Amino acid sequence: MYQLKYRRSDNRIELITEYGEKKLLNDSISSKPTISPGGLKAIYLSPCEWESITKLYLFDLGNGDNIQLIGDIDGAYMPKGAIWIDNSYLALIIGFGTFSDGGNVYLYNLMDSQLIKITDWDQRKQVVKLEYNSGFLKCKGIEYLSDMMEEYIEFKEILDIKLYTL
């Protein structure tokens, strides 16, 4: 079984093999990996650097496979955040470009790679943080008051994801 250790000092992920060997998982600054509810897989975003095209990866702690799940979408949208719903579904924030903090909420089905859009807001309204609890997705975000995107208000919204999953 492989292990992932997040190095907060340089925002890198260290891979510890089943033999205790340590090496960097990749060459980029990454988000802290999140382990699946079953403890067999992990997700992380990389590179997590300003003005970089961020991608979502799935790491299999059993066999060491590291798979890119989502890169840029239509050349303009990319993952900004991801959390586990269960061993089959992820909740994602996918936003516009490299400059936005958040975006719309999606579900990703790991069994068939289906991406399901849950919210459909323009760039002025963005979810920036997701939390999951007992079938409900708690979204925290910002809504800009004008197209200039200088002033904003914070909002919270709760989504019943059972409406979108089996």
Where do the protein language model's features map onto the residues?
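Blade-terminus and WD-like Trp-Asp/Gly-His loop motifs, strongest in beta-propeller folds
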Residues: 33-41, 81-89, 129-136
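Beta-strand C-termini and the immediately following turn/loop, strongest in propeller blades
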Residues: 2-9, 43-50, 91-99, 138-146
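Beta-strand-rich domains and repeat architectures in extracellular enzymes and scaffolds
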Residues: 1-13, 22-37
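Surface-exposed acidic loop/strand-edge motifs in secreted or periplasmic proteins
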Residues: 45-55, 70-81
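Structural motif
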Residues: 9-13, 51-57, 99-106, 145-161
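Long, low-complexity intrinsically disordered regions enriched in Ser/Thr/Pro/Gly
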Residues: 44-45, 77-80, 131-135, 139-148, ...
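Conserved binding-pocket/active-site segment within a compact domain
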Residues: 90-95, 100-142
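Multi-bladed beta-propeller domains
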Residues: 16-30, 62-78, 111-124
